[in-house]
Amino acid sequence: MAVPKRRMSRANTRSRRAQWKATATNLVGVTVAGQQRKVPRRLLKAARLGLIDLDRR
């Protein structure tokens, strides 16, 4: 495991952590039972097969 050689200042630590951002998931349109819905791409197949309930929003 990497160990820092010197202590990092508070300002440098916070500016480094500020770069860590969560990204919004890209939504893709899918038609299920005649209704157009937007789901994340990784759930597209499950939504088409009816494995997830899209009405619980």
Swiss-Prot record:
Disulfide partners: none
The UniProt record lists the keyword Iron: no
One Pfam short name: Ribosomal_L32p
UniProt-listed InterPro entries: Ribosomal_bL32, Ribosomal_zn-bd
Entry GO MF terms: structural constituent of ribosome
GO cellular component assignments: large ribosomal subunit
Keyword entries, A-Z: Ribonucleoprotein, Ribosomal protein
SUPFAM superfamilies hit by this protein: Zn-binding ribosomal proteins (SSF57829)
Record GO biological process: translation
Family designation: Belongs to the bacterial ribosomal protein bL32 family.
The protein's name in its UniProt record: Large ribosomal subunit protein bL32
Species the sequence originates in: Mycolicibacterium vanbaalenii (strain DSM 7251 / JCM 13017 / BCRC 16820 / KCTC 9966 / NRRL B-24157 / PYR-1)
Gene from which this protein is expressed: rpmF
